[in-house]
Amino acid sequence: MTRRYWNINLEEMMEAGVHFGHGTRKWNPRMAPYISAKRKGIHITNLTRTARFLSEACDLVFDAASRGKQFLIVGTKNKAADSVASAAIRARCHYVNKKWLGGMSTNWSTTETRLHKFRDLRAEQKTGRFNRLPKRDAAMLKRQLSHLQTYLGGIKYMTGLPDIVIIVDQQEEYTALRECVTLGIPTICLIDTNCDPDLADISIPANDDAIASIRFILNKLVSAICEGRSSYIRNR
């Protein structure tokens, strides 16, 4: 895998608050190598190491995208949801930003069945079939469609398991991470000072609570994906 330059600026990371960790009482000792200081009861992440791992992650996703691989971005907490959706749409990735339904990847056949149902209902709505049904039946189908749109809207075009999964908050998305580990799907994970750096394939030490920090990391990753996709299209 070729190493590339991704213009990861330490000052910009500081402005985005990437370096702010959790309180010193709420930490995982395995994060010690990624912490540079304590300040007013808060752990400060070593941004040089953050930049190194973010650069590695960008190299990985660029390489994968240049070979036509598929990505899934997962981040369901309120602070991450909008950034996850906009980043995924920009890079033409799949995403989950409301709730990870248990077994979404490990029980893929069930997810696939739900996706087929979702697509069928969308098609029926577009053709106006709902309008020709009794009100009660139409209302029931609309509720089903709304529910499926909420939880599966970001993966509606997914036809198989993703090649790489990007996870915004390790603790919040622990179920998703464990499913990826079980299936051997490579993972890139933002990890705050209360996380375990050994669970993901590439762990990026960063503030996973601040919107600006989440957006900074995702922007770098999706820029690399977009470059990789352009390379893939040129070389086809």
From Swiss-Prot:
GO terms for molecular function: structural constituent of ribosome. It is found in: Plastid, Chloroplast. GO terms for cellular component: chloroplast; mitochondrial small ribosomal subunit. Gene3D superfamilies: Glucose-6-phosphate isomerase like protein, domain 1, Helix hairpin bin. The keyword Ribosomal protein applies. Its main location: plastid. The keyword Ribonucleoprotein applies. One of its GO terms (biological process) is translation. InterPro entries: Ribosomal_uS2, Ribosomal_uS2_bac/mit/plastid, Ribosomal_uS2_CS, Ribosomal_uS2_flav_dom_sf. It comes from the Eukaryota. Keywords: Chloroplast, Plastid, Ribonucleoprotein, Ribosomal protein. Belongs to the universal ribosomal protein uS2 family. This is Small ribosomal subunit protein uS2c. It comes from Nandina domestica.
